């Protein structure tokens, strides 16, 4: 399926991007910083891989692979990523690694997948078992944090861990429903603080 305007837009983004300064995440560049490991870049790279799957155009795969390869070292460590930061947002970009590993089998991608999965093993949790959004936000569960962690978590469990963590993930969703869903509207609040220390 041809989408000329869409393809032109995506191609321009790629042409204006370098591996350190992607055009779609220009905020870092404006701050004088190189891009690191983050959900914004992860979302875009995953989109490029989906475009590659839909069109077969190798330029999308090649850019995506180069972008991630630039950040992932041979031992699986990831530039500007730290497990000990316990930032659930940084798990999201790990979804790119599943797609790339399936396409090219680079062992360093599998090692990086395992590294990110190790964060979930030690990520601080609420008493009911939900991942804290970030170590700097103790006892807080945010709705977007569910998007950041759970798809990666479930893909790992499905592909590599005989689905052992699926019940844990399900329970986290049920806790979110219990604490964050407005019964009258069916809509969800953005977050909750189990400690009740935050003003909201």
Stretches with model-predicted labels:
Residues 1-72, 107-115, 119-123, 127-128:
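Low-complexity, Ser/Thr/Pro/Gly-enriched N-terminal "stalk/linker" regions
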Residues 4-15, 26-27, 77-82, 132-138, ...:
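Surface loop/turn signatures of beta-propeller and other carbohydrate-active proteins
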Residues 37-53, 85-102, 141-158:
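Well-ordered alpha-helical segments within folded domains of soluble proteins
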Residues 60, 65-95:
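Mid-chain, structured segments of secreted extracytoplasmic proteins
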Residues 77-79, 108, 183:
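Boundary/linker segments of alpha-helical solenoid repeat arrays
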Residues 92, 115-119, 172:
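Hydrophobic alpha-helical segments of small multi-pass membrane proteins
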Residues 127-193, 198-200:
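Aromatic- and glycine-enriched pocket-lining scaffold segments that form the walls
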């Amino acid at each position: 399926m041809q989408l000329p305007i869409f393809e032109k837009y995506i191609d321009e983004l790629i042409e204006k991007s370098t591996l350190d300064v992607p055009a779609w995440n220009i905020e870092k560049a404006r701050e004088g910083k190189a891009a690191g490991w983050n959900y914004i870049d992860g979302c875009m790279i995953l989109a490029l891989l989906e475009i590659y799957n839909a069109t077969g155009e190798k330029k999308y795969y090649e850019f995506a692979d180069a972008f991630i390869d630039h950040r992932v070292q041979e031992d699986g460590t990831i530039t500007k990523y730290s497990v000990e930061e316990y930032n659930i947002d940084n798990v999201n970009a790990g979804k790119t690694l599943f797609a790339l590993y399936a396409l090219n089998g680079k062992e360093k991608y599998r090692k990086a997948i395992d590294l990110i999965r190790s964060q979930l093993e030690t990520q601080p949790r609420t008493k009911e078992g939900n991942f804290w959004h970030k170590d700097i936000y103790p006892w807080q569960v945010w709705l977007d944090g569910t998007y950041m962690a759970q798809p990666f978590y479930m893909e790992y469990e499905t592909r590599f861990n005989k689905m052992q963590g699926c019940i844990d993930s399900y329970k986290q969703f049920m806790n979110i429903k219990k604490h964050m869903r407005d019964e009258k509207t069916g809509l969800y609040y953005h977050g909750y603080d189990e400690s009740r220390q935050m003003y909201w």
